[in-house]
A protein has these predicted regions:
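A short secondary-structure junction signal
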Residues: 67-70, 99-100
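Conserved SAM/SAH cofactor-binding pocket of Class I
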Residues: 81-110
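Non-catalytic substrate-recognition/targeting regions of SAM-dependent transferases
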Residues: 3-68, 76, 80
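Proteins with a high burden of low-complexity, intrinsically disordered sequence enriched in S/T/G/P/A and R
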Residues: 1-5, 107-110
Length: 110
């Protein structure tokens, strides 16, 4: 807990932003559908610029934003390699990979 407080104190200066611009989330073990439970009702959306895509995320209302940072390189690669290809996203959670594919020129026209 002390380390978390130290990180929260240091982040605004390290990121050169105001403390109110930083959203903190603390994960704990979830069971069943608990991870999808609504935590807040702000409904505030933030636009994330990722490659050619503009993606809306909700940082407050749920534990997950739906935009996973570790998937970013793959989403960008999909956009780079999608031109002229059909794209079917069978494991879609948020559709962000599909957005990149569409922007990269993928389609389903035959």
């Amino acid at each position: 807990e002390r380390r978390l407080d130290e990180v929260r104190s240091a982040l605004p200066a390290a990121l050169d932003t105001a403390a109110e611009n930083i959203v903190y989330k603390q994960r704990s073990r979830q069971r069943g559908t608990e991870q999808y439970t609504k935590r807040d009702s702000r409904g505030e959306l933030l636009t994330v610029h990722e490659g050619r895509a503009r993606l809306l995320v909700n940082l407050h209302d749920y534990i997950d934003t739906g935009l996973f940072l570790d998937h970013r390189p793959l989403r960008l690669r999909i956009g780079q390699e999608a031109a002229g290809k059909d794209f079917l996203n069978l494991f879609c959670y948020t559709g962000t990979a599909t957005v990149h594919a569409a922007l990269g020129g993928a389609g389903t026209d035959r």
